[in-house]
Swiss-Prot record:
Provenance organism: Bradyrhizobium diazoefficiens (strain JCM 10833 / BCRC 13528 / IAM 13628 / NBRC 14792 / USDA 110)
Protein name listed in UniProt: Chaperonin GroEL 4
UniProt key word Chaperone: yes
Superkingdom, taxonomy of origin: Bacteria
Chief site of localization: cytoplasm
Subunit relationships: Forms a cylinder of 14 subunits composed of two heptameric rings stacked back-to-back. Interacts with the co-chaperonin GroES.
Length: 543
């Protein structure tokens, strides 16, 4: 197919126009008094949203070259959302400022490479300043504030803060479609895995179809249990204590199950299959052993069930099992051993490539942390529930980011107050490098300026007062006053703030160092061809 090309400054101008058009649709949504954007859909009612990534994902520009710029910046918002869960609009506001100012600098004769080096140096100074100023999160109130700002819903913020508080920042917290119109939280304490009882004849709670065993011993093995006699010795030892027995075994013969179910053993024994498959199963069994304080009677170590003693068995305060899931609550493992195992898995997770292996390690880390939570999204329609799930996921990412790396004053305050830091660190650098540094310094105040402008205030006055105020004092756009932002609960996770800036600088560097654009030649469609109504005459009439 024939191509059309655009070169040099005309190419960068086209990209900048596309970025500006996309940003114009996003910038007015920023802040507590930002306006909505309404997006038409081919079927159904329009989307009404103030979420930057939602709006950006719906925008395609008719000019192919301008659309390239819009799509590149849209990717910035999506990357920011994926990493930090929030800050999508801020990332696009920053990117637009850097790109428009950068293109203007290039037209004045600046060299793109030096300009971009200056941008990168200034950004890293700001990132280090933000990280060093981050305030650790130590209370539920702050987590709730972060989640509420990210989701724009105080109820969701409260549920997410409760979930993080109850299962920990490394615990499993997921979202799902609810069965009612209300959004609710369900928390399961302990380690859970997706394997249930192997026979419903083991059930102790008929109404819930669950097996609930109090203070059981837990036998873990990868051996194939072929005959009832293999378990006779260990069952006798457990029976002497008067406690029930949970067996987690890879394979157990039907005649063994029949023997276990007989003799009035309901409520005294539970058999479940081990979690996962392959080498992940072995790792999960080892995790279970550490959590419960037992050991895996393993084939490769020459283990024999007949020789198993009570010291080889794990314990727990309670074990609950349904047809699909087993939960071990308050395992009897040593706290120091569990912490060491968690640290080991966390290190493996950090070194693993971002694929299925990292996901599995993250799942193991969460299980070792001792809890799972599910937030069920309520709503009248599936569309409403889907939107709620998106908000939950974004707010959850933001809350976790805050718990892991801390918070900074929100409302654009932290970025705006980093401008003097850039001056002190890099103010003596001139030339094109200095031009890039100056560009970052001027762009840092843009989010605060748009928040003030969208609330009906004089952006220039607000920014000037903001940069002269003491650290942490920012502009509460909702009430039109300057206050201590952290005390007021107007905060952002530091990861959200520096990720937005880094991603904005990355895309700006890409645009400013682009010299050629290549696109397909638009195809001419003859309106008189095809089965259009009226033979195409209605199209000719519009033309």
């Amino acid at each position: 197919m024939p191509k059309v090309l655009l070169h040099d400054i005309e190419a960068r101008r086209a990209l900048a126009r596309g970025v500006q058009k996309l940003a114009a649709a996003i910038e007015s949504t920023l802040g507590p008094k930002g306006m909505n954007a309404m997006v038409d859909r081919p079927i159904g009612t329009p989307i009404v949203s103030r979420d930057g990534v939602t709006i950006a994902s719906e925008i395609e520009l008719p000019d192919r070259f301008e659309n390239m710029g819009a799509q590149v910046v849209r990717e910035v918002s999506m990357q920011t959302n994926e990493v930090a869960g929030d800050g999508t609009t801020t990332a696009m506001v920053l990117a637009n400022g850097l790109i428009q100012g950068g293109v203007a600098a290039l037209e004045r004769g600046a060299k793109a490479v030096d300009l971009c080096k200056g941008i990168d140096r200034a950004v890293e100074v700001v990132v280090e300043s933000l990280k060093s100023a981050a305030i650790p999160v130590s209370d539920r109130r702050t987590l709730q504030a972060v989640a509420t700002i990210a989701s724009t819903d105080s109820h969701l913020g409260d549920l997410i803060a409760e979930a993080v508080e109850r299962v920990g920042k490394d615990g499993i917290i997921s979202s799902d479609y609810g069965l009612t119109t209300s959004t609710t939280l369900e928390v399961v304490e302990g380690m859970s895995f997706d394997r249930g009882y192997i026979s419903h004849h083991m059930v102790t709670d008929v109404e819930k179809m669950e097996v609930v065993l109090e203070q059981p011993y837990i036998l873990l093995t990868d051996l194939k249990i072929k005959a009832p006699g293999e378990l006779a010795a260990v069952r006798a030892r457990v029976a002497e204590t008067g406690k029930p027995l949970v067996i987690v075994a890879e394979e157990i013969a039907p005649e063994v199950v029949v023997t276990l179910l007989g003799e009035g053993n309901r409520g005294k024994v539970l058999v479940v299959n081990p979690p996962d498959y392959g080498h992940w199963r072995k790792a999960m069994m080892d995790d279970l052993a550490i959590i419960t304080g037992g050991r895996v009677i393993a084939r490769e170590l020459g283990g024999m069930l007949e020789e198993a003693s009570l010291a080889d068995l794990g314990t727990a305060r309670q074990v609950r099992a349904s047809a699909r899931e087993t939960v071990i609550i308050r395992g009897g493992g040593d706290d120091a051993a569990i912490a060491a195992r968690r640290q080991q898995v966390a290190k493996q997770h950090d070194l693993a490539p971002p694929n299925i292996e990292q996901d599995k390690l993250k799942e193991r880390l969460a299980k070792l942390s001792g809890g799972t939570a599910v937030i069920f999204a309520g709503g009248v329609t599936p569309v409403e529930q889907k939107r709620t799930i998106q908000l939950i996921d974004d707010a959850l990412s933001a809350a976790r980011a805050a718990a892991e790396e801390g918070i900074v004053p929100g409302g654009g305050t932290a970025l705006a107050q980093c401008a003097p830091v850039v001056v002190r660190a890099l103010g003596n650098i001139n030339g094109d490098l200095g031009e890039g540094i100056k560009l970052v310094r001027e762009t840092l105040s843009r989010p605060a300026a748009f928040i003030a402008r969208n609330a009906g205030h004089d952006a220039a006055k607000v920014v000037a007062e903001l940069q002269s105020s003491r650290a942490g004092v920012g502009f509460d756009a909702a009430n039109g006053v300057f206050i201590d932002m952290v005390s007021a609960g107007i905060v952002d996770p530091v990861r959200v703030t520096y990720t937005a800036l880094r991603n904005a600088a990355s895309v700006a560097t890409l645009v400013l160092t682009t010299n050629t654009l290549v696109a397909d030649v638009p195809e001419y469609v003859d309106p008189t061809q095809g089965p259009a109504l009226g033979g195409g005459a209605e199209k000719l009439g519009r033309a």
